[in-house]
């Protein structure tokens, strides 16, 4: 296939009116490498890389933690239709036996061209700090456990790309030292202070789970996890872009503070995404969703009800430059989990995960 005359998003964040060549599901460098010369006229359209959501629990009344193959496939189809072509289903804090079944599901689900591609699993619990548990069930939280993690990853067929860890919990130092070369270790759901967080980053935990949420605020005398992440140029930070979790001023300032290569937009979406107001569930707890805000009975925000593409558009509406928002939803998440050689930009050799939009970033077609 040849996609003609589109405004193609470049690796540097600029647009260039050019043709894009696809052969056997991959982007190639020239028309000479294309056997199927079918043309798709993209005149007047923007051509974006498919989005990469590394932190999402579910959508359309299904949750990864349901351990349901058909439900997971439905989530993947929803995500693909909304411009998310690479996806990390994300678990909650649950008993070990349940987690093993959940991770097996990701290995077993049938995927085709209607689905977002599973590029890894995000293991958000159970190695969290009860003080900052958020919407996770405290009774299932446990100390960092290397063998527990490895059992889960074995059940997942080695697909776990990311694991959240509270570095102030007993056993975290050994966990980071032992596993930081096997999996991306993300600091999150923690009351850790700056010193603790900075030391964890020094040991190899160079990612932060949903910055600002489920951690202490940054103070001028105690900068905490946020300050440690800002100070470490190798640290990537997730940020929920739904317009509910974080104030627009903070969103804009985060991009200024961390630059255009370290912010990873995520949805943190749960099963209410794509649904109407009503009652739903997350991690075994009842959640009320009203006007895209999902909360537990005590008012705690319980994930988002917004897909990543809409999160990206939301942060643009807050004043974040379009190029930075798109990079934060494509290249940056791909880099953060080590898959940028396959996805995240429209570069020859990578998967032809392509989203066509109008000038206002309304989706026209997902390839």
Predicted regions and their residues:
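C-terminal cap of metal-dependent C-N hydrolases
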Residues: 6, 335, 345-367
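Histidine-rich, glycine-flanked metal-binding segment
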Residues: 1-48
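Di-metal (Zn2+ and/or Mg2+/Mn2+) metal-binding site signature of metallo-dependent hydrolases
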Residues: 45-69
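Active-site glycine- and acidic-residue-rich loops that bind
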Residues: 95-101, 168-170, 186-191, 240-252, ...
